[in-house]
Every structure is written in C-alpha cells, then in structure tokens.
Amino acid sequence: LASGLGLALLLGGCGGQVQQGQDQNSGSTPAGVDKPLLLVSYAVTKSAYDRILPRFQAAWKAQTGKELAIRTSYGGSASQTRAIIDGLDADVAALALAGDVLKLEKAGLVDPGWEKELPNGSIITNSVVAFLTRPGNPKGVKQWADLARPGVSVITANPKTSGGARWNFLGLWGSVARTGGTEAQAKDFVSAVYRKVDNLPKDAREATDTFLKRGQGDVLLNYENEAIQATKAGELQTPFVVPEVNVRIEGPVVIVDRNVERHGNRPAAEALAKYLSSEAAQRIFAEEGFRPVHPQVWDQVRSRFAPVKTLFDAASFGGWKSIDQTFFAKGAVWDQLFAEKR
C-alpha cells in the first residue's frame, strides 16, 4: 500500500466528507504530485473504498511517479446525485443505480454513452435485497409475502434519498409483478408493506443503524452487503434471509466529464474508474459483501453468496427512465402510496 510520511501528509483529508460546492482542485499542485480527485459514492460503499483507494494510489504512483490525493464523500445515492448537480465537484461518481447517472447526464455533467466507456456497461458491483431479522426470526419472515402479514414492522430507507431504497421498492414490486401477478396486485402488496414502515431513514447505512442500534422494526430490507457486514461485525445474531425471488442491484461508476475537464485530471479519473473493474478491486468488493462483476472473481466466490432462483433487473421494468417516471417522479406511484400511508 502507498504509505510514508509525505503521502500521509498529502492525504491527511482523504476519506473525509467534502462539502457541497467545494472545489478541491483549485490552485496549483507541487512537482511530483498529481491533481487530486473527488470520489462521490453511496453510503454503504465506504468500507470497500477505504481498502481499494490506497491500492489504486500505490499503482498510480508506480506508473506515473506522482502522488495522487483522493477525497471521498458518502451518502444516500439520490442525495449525492442532487449534490453533484448543485455543485459538489465530483470527478468520479460511483452511485447506487444507473438512474442517478442519467440525472447527471440530463444535467449536462456526464456525456451520453457513458455506459460504453467502461467494462460491463460501467457496472462495478452487483447485489440483491436481504432481510435482516431479530434473533431467532420470531416473525418467521422468509419471503416477500411475509412482509405484509399482520404484526410485522418493516424498516427500509427513503426512496426519495436512497438508491438502495429504490431497489427495495423494485424488489417488493417485482416479487409480485415478475412472478405472475398483475401490476394492480403489485401495487396493493407494496402499499400494504409500506403501511408497516414507521420511519424512512435517509440512506441504507442509517437504515441499518435504525434496525440494529436503535432496535426499531421486526425486519430490515437492505443490501445483501450490509447484512454480510453486520454479520461479520457480530451485530446480527440470526442469519439473514435472501429471498429466492430477487432483484439484481447494479451499481455503476461514471466520470463526471464537465468537472474533470475543468479540473484537468481526466487521466487519473479514467484510471480510477477502470481500476474498479479490475480483479484486485473486485476481490475487495467481494470481501466487503458485494457480488463481483468480474467473471473469474465471481466464479471463485459464488459459493459464499446465497443462491437466487428468480432474478429480475431494472431492464425488466423498462430501464431507469421508465422506472423513475412510473414510480418515483412527482405524483407517481411512490407519492401516491406515501399519501395513502399518511
């Protein structure tokens, strides 16, 4: 790993939150130091990037002879997307869903065709939805339908601020509509589940804290990687449940073209984005609970993850433009359900 006093001083702020609108690349850089990067990502990726970024920095120095500072910002994917549009100077954005990248594209920050710039359609991680339950799973929650049973209290993040919450929503909807049910039946089921949600944390990590640290709810819907991390940390006493019918959660990475053009750091931004698909980075993602997209790595670690019999994805809903228009736009299905809940 990159280390040493000089690099430690240079990267003293690396990993800290960057305030919206702050230009971390202003001013000149000394000899032997490259222009810094800002990576903006969603909340639950921090543990992976804490391990991946130092390895990339070491590889960059070995290749170029220059130190590279990388600052980071984490939060709910929808909130991070809005922050970038409003002025957060991201050079690389690793978000929870392609729909958020499309918003950056619509805002003129990302060039069209970003899906073709990197391997695997610019997707760097996969995951699925997991259910975390209380010790012994006293409510017997094993499948999606169990969430609508009387007496089952559900915790999930807010789809307006959290990408993971949108995936949870699609998982709920698809568990009916992608297994032979009608759209009307799916809406009734999703409505029944959300009536059991007492509060909506702003992101997936806060949802985990609400369930595990504050003791709220009978079951938490969250990323599988969050469940794996909670198990490793000894915070989850009962094995989590991965429903056999599930949604493929795809996390993209993108270079924020307008920002890197202004900052003059495109080579480093492109190198970082590509590195995230490398075997080395994908192994770390797998160790942190994500399902890797690198074929060889996935073949080697597949047995660590619960099998899923029926796996649908965003494309089965018509893609993220259609998903946002149908479910999450102003006045769309989510707003209707939320109004009913209130």
Which functions belong to the PLM regions below?
Residues 179-245, 252:
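Ligand-binding pocket segment of bilobal, Venus flytrap-like solute-binding proteins
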Residues 136-142, 161, 174-182, 259-269:
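Short helix-loop capping/hinge motifs at secondary-structure junctions, enriched
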Residues 17-161, 303, 342:
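N-terminal segment of the mature folded domain
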Residues 14-17, 260-342:
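Extracellular/periplasmic juxtamembrane helices and adjacent flexible linkers that interface
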Residues 40-42, 133-134, 153-179, 193-197, ...:
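Short beta-strand->loop
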Residues 54-62, 85-89, 98, 105-109, ...:
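Sec-exported extracytoplasmic/periplasmic mature domains
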Residues 9-13:
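C-terminal motif of bacterial Sec signal peptides marking the signal peptidase cleavage site
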Residues 1-7:
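Sec-dependent N-terminal signal peptides
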